[in-house]
Structure formats: C-alpha cells, structure tokens
Amino acid sequence: MSYVIDRRLNGKNKSTVNRQRFLRRYREHIKKAVEEAVSRRSITDMEHGEQISIPGRDIDEPVLHHGRGGRQTVVHPGNKEFTAGEHIARPSGGGGGRGGGKASNSGEGMDDFVFQITQEEFLDFMFEDLELPNLVKRHITGTDTFKTVRAGISNDGNPSRINIVRTLRSAHARRIALSGGSRAKLRAALKELERIKREEPDNLGDIQELELEIAKLRARIDRVPFLDTFDLKYNLLVKQPNPTSKAVMFCLMDVSGSMTQATKDIAKRFFILLYLFLKRNYEKIEVVFIRHHTSAREVDEEEFFYSRETGGTIVSSALKMMQEIMAERYPTHEWNIYAAQASDGDNWNDDSPVCRDILLKQIMPFVQYYTYVEITPREHQALWFEYERVREAFEDSFAQQQIVSASDIYPVFRELFQRRLVA
C-alpha cells in the first residue's frame, strides 16, 4: 500500500492559483461591480466582501463552428407545397445564439454566474492603481532600519520559535510513513488470529505463531520514535529594510449648520474611503482629524465620524489649526504632508480670501498634495473660486473636485488619488 504525504503550504486553498487567474480574466466585470457596491453601501459596510454577477454569455469559451450565413445550394425532396425550381425563404433567427436568461416560449438561456469575493479581494480592486502623489523619502539617516517579518518555516532555529503544530504534523507523517507497512500486517494478523480462534480453537501451533508475529510487529511499531529531530520545525524570521519615509494626512471636515445631514454623510463616506485606503496601502502613516464650524478642533477618529456638534462657518479656523499642528509636530524636512478637505462651499464671505492667503503662503509650499472636495448640487460660491487661484499657483500639488450625490464619491476619490505616470 502506498502513502502520500501532502506537505503543501496552502493545502486548504488548493485552487488559489485558479482563483487568481479567474479574477484576472474577469477584472473589468469585478471592478465595475466594486464601483457600484461602493456607491450604494452604507458607511459601516464599506470594507466587506461582495457578490459578483457575470452574464452567462461572457463566460462562454470561444468555439469554431459553421456559420449560418452565406448562400448554399441544397436539394430538398418535393412536396405538395413546392415544385421544382422554387426558392425557400431563409429561416428567421438563424444566428444560433442563446437567450438572455429571461422567460421565452422558444430557445434556451443561461443564468448569470454569481460568486463571492473576499474582503481582501474587494479592497484590492477598490484601491487598485491608487497612491499618495509626490511621496518622497525624507530625513534619511546614516543607519538603515529593519523590521522583522515571518518568512515561512525552517528546519533549524531557536527553540523559542518552534512551531508546535507543524512539528507534530511532520512527526505524524513520518510515523505513518515508517510504520504503515507494519500496521497493515498487524491488522491482517489480528484478523487472522481472531478467525482461527473462532473456527479452529484447537490449532494451537498456528495460534502461537500468529501471537509471536503480532508481538514482533508491535515491537517494531513501538521502535518508531514519537518525535525525531527531523520533525522539528521553526518559524523563520527575516529582516526587511524599513523605508524611512514618514507621512501624515490631515482630514478637515466642515460640520457647520449649512451642511445638511445628507451632505455630512457624503463627507463621512469620503473620509472613511480615504482612511481605509491609507491604512491598507501604507503601513506607517499618521492621520490628524480636524472638525470645524466657527472654530476648529482636533479630535480622535470616533469623534470625527460620529460627533453631532455644529455651528456657523469659518473655514480659515481649520486651516490655521492645520498650520499650527504642522509647525509643532511635523517638520516639513522630515514629513510628507497631505491634506483632504470636505465642505459644502458655504463660508463667510470675508473669510474666503483669508483661506486663500493661508493656503498660498503657509500651507501649500510645505505639503506634498492638498485635495478639496465641495459637496453641493448648487453653483459654486466664493470659496471655490478662491481655491481655483490656489490651484493655478500649485497645479501639481492642489486638486479640487465637486461631489453632487453619493454615487460621485468613488469616481471623485479615484480621480484625486489616481496613480500618475512619471516620464
């Protein structure tokens, strides 16, 4: 009898390669479904998996076959309706196609193919080809920094890093391989001994011979050690270079009275999308949350998304606070500084020029990228036009977009953080 020991690392996911090939093949269908899911989901469901539906006609393999078109000369037997030399009209619907999956009194159809993508796959497609623009390495010191990461299993290592599960699995496989033949013979001998005792109880010679053989087989099996040095498996840890780039993202959200609940919800969904993108794509990045109405305040993540505080509108208060925090905690020669601002554009008229001056003189010269999102279905107001002057001065590091409804969130987000081709 042969024994096959499966030592593959991904034994529970034997179709991983096939699944990845399938996802690559139907990438466009999946990306479209992900975009639609992001637009319709609530804030709390933003990072879950998704069911993907692919039309049945799109999963058919190409097949070479005889076409139904062209002119053919065919001789049919005559009948009472047709006589020699008459031409028969071409049958309608001769394309050989299939139905679209709906009810019909003729033809055949195929249901859409539906499958589930995981949370990791959903986020991979959602943030594909996105990055923080102008990210550079700053504050390079003379010493390299490293981080320790898992790199599989090794046969040698420190006893403190022994992998008990893999060790016992290896020992069990070795015992099966070394004693499998003896165990099979032992089972056969025990079965034969039971038969002889039942059918030939007086055949003492054969009984003694079988008992002696059984004792030898058991002794041979017992000599196989439970654990051998060959079985020991250790977690392998290696050092990887740790990039020295440091980045911080400032999130500025308008919570003034002019922001309706629907507008605030759109702003929160935009910032949650941004927060997921940062935490997933960048291992070390700090996020500073600032809420503002007539005054600005730095808050934590919980208060930023769920506080109900409101008031008037002075946008410059948030910009001033951002500038103060930059000067106090984030030296520009060490940090890549980014900012994302969301507002409905409603601001005290005398304050909009102040916002422009703060951006032009105190913020934009020191940041890598600044994005402004205006959430309103109405015409733009003074703040938007002042920010246009900032964009003219900093074309590569300042961007502004308008969001009218929730369906615009994801397209605008991709437009703001689309990976740029470097010439």
Swiss-Prot record:
NCBIfam families membership: PRK05325.1-2 (NF003707), PRK05325.1-3 (NF003708)
Superkingdom in the source lineage: Bacteria
Disulfide bonds: none
Region annotation (Disordered) ranges: 84-107
InterPro entries per UniProt: UPF0229 (IPR006698)
Short name of any one Pfam family annotated for the protein: DUF444
Organism encoding this protein: Pseudomonas aeruginosa (strain ATCC 15692 / DSM 22644 / CIP 104116 / JCM 14847 / LMG 12228 / 1C / PRS 101 / PAO1)
Biased composition regions of type Gly residues, renumbered to the chain: 92-102
Family statement: Belongs to the UPF0229 family.
Name of this chain's protein: UPF0229 protein PA0587
